[in-house]
Curated annotation (Swiss-Prot):
One of its GO terms (biological process) is gastrulation. Belongs to the G-protein coupled receptor 2 family. Mth subfamily. It is a multi-pass membrane protein. It is found in: Cell membrane. PROSITE patterns: G_PROTEIN_RECEP_F2_4. CDD domains: 7tmB3_Methuselah-like. Residues 609-621 have a biased composition (Polar residues). It comes from Drosophila melanogaster (Fruit fly). Residues 357-365, 425-441, 510-540, 584-676 are cytoplasmic. This is Probable G-protein coupled receptor Mth-like 1. One of its GO terms (molecular function) is G protein-coupled receptor activity.
Amino acid sequence: MDRSRSSRAASSNQFIRPCGLLTTVILLQTLVSMSLAIEEMSPPPAAPPRPSPPPTVKLNKCCHSGEYLNDGTCIAGSEALWLPMVYLVQQQRFFEPHGASPRFLKFLPNTRPTCRKDQTTEIFRSRGANVMLFPNGTLYVRERALMVQPSDYCVDWEVAVVCLNDSQPINALEDPDYAANPLVQQEPPKASLRLSKCCGKWGSYNTQLQNCDLQPNHQAAVDGLLRLSPQLPEGSYQTSYGLPDCGQPGGYSIAGDWQDAKLDRNTAMLQLPHKNLSAGQYCLEHTQREGEVKIIACQHLFSSAAGAGIHDGSIGGTIEQANGQNLQKAVLTGGILVSIVFLSATLVAGFLLPAVHHALHWRCQICYVTCLLFGKILLAIEELSSSLQPGSAACHTLAITMQFFFLAAFFWLNTMCFNIWWTFRDFRPSSLERNQEALRRYLYSLYAWGGPLLITFVAACVDQLPETTLLRPGFGQLYCWFDNRNLSIFAYFYGPIGLLLCANIALFVSTTHQLTCGLWKRDDVKSSSEKSALGRVCLKLVVVMGVTWIADILSWLVGGPHGVWFFTDLINALQGVFIFIVVGCQPQVWTACRRIFCPRLRHDITNTTNGVQHSSSSQGLPSMAGGTEITQNTTTTTTTTNTTATHMPSNPAEDEVPEKAPIAPVAPIVKMETIC
């Protein structure tokens, strides 16, 4: 019975469940249909009321209709859209089109404010929203962060004439306490020096985003003023607000650090390394780093600035000075291009002599010329390319790559100078085994490639750190080079190069001393022709060891007008020409060229050269070692063969030096070649 009772209960439950679900669905459908019917019968909600137009406000126009204000004088002719920008507070937008007048603004023509005795008249430019109007007629001057009543100003095309009180109220838009207590007064300093803060009263410059950060900055959160101590004590200057009026497209750039600049307190002119900025051409701004202040200026002022070793002149010069600077820049750029051609020819000349490719000095020479060639090419691209913009990835990459190749060139130059000095250090016979020469080659490569790579890697890593007290190189910020800060460019470029050049000069002095005081006094060198040839060797060493590069370091350290260093800059720009004269203008090179381009002469040249001189040492390199054939195996055995064929000397100095009787090879015989 229990089992039958339970079975009946289960069957009844199975029947009740679907019936209950069906009933629920029917009820829901009924409720939905009733709610839709009610919504259709109810009237639509009322639209929000349109904001009532503001009351009519009368403002002063400085000149008559159809006239505009220019240097305090009304001149016929005006623009249709002449009004400063009007900000509609309720709609939170500017009235469009910009320059047009809303209907609620009425203007009294040819009406200027009457300033009281305790007021001064000042004219403000309205470009870049420096001046804007509010619907109640209040004028906001962003440059001074102040509000002006309609009776104290007049407006015209791109200008506003304002009567300024001795003490102006704090900006109501930017100071939250002003709304609660509008009687708060801001006492400006009495100093006449006025410096502009770029990003407004409470903003700062974000170096990562490369724009203004309008969030309150901890350095300006107190009063929104510039903090320029210890260079300028507080109270010795006034703070205005806004970016400079460029007048040309192109935006703004970081011109440098405030700590590296010199300020003329009388004129507010700012002197940067090789650049002067007048008071209206720059502004200052704090960054997120404690104590750091950047100088921001119009980018077009630096569009012609140079990269490594080439400096721009002052902006505030005459037209003749500007033309002279442009001419000097064009000449130097042309010198760089000419140097590129001759450096390429030098590489070709070096590869025309496969017999000397094993020489260690030849390898150092080729690496030096190659690095200098690539550095010059990148510098020419930076000078001539108009598509490279500071801040771009291409500009950043170009700056890092150019630093590496220039550093590598000077490291290889130092290696080559050491190799020259090592060869001439005591004029004693020295022979290197093949494994010893290979070891020196590996050590040279490790030093000359590893040093620049390490310096460039450290500079690139420091430049990408978000927060650090280390010196940032600032690649690609202002130029496609360093950001023109003295300490950073010294630490990562001029400092290492200066040390290498000092070492090169010491090696040059030691080498020339060995040539003049050592070889000159030997019995081998007595005639005046031999001594003059030896003097030409020393002259070539000046080019080889990069002695003239020291002038580029001095021009950076001393500074001054660009014309003072024009001659030395031109010599360094044409360095490739001088290197080609020393290396490419060798008789062996011309002989190789004739052998390649004149096949009929190959047989004659081979016959004549086979009967002249044979040496057990490696063939000398027509290198930059002052025209001297530098070999590592200097112990030689020389035999002379008389030939009836045309004499083709392997050493052109033999045409100058009188023939001598053979002497015992106690010391190496230094063969000198004449300059081209």
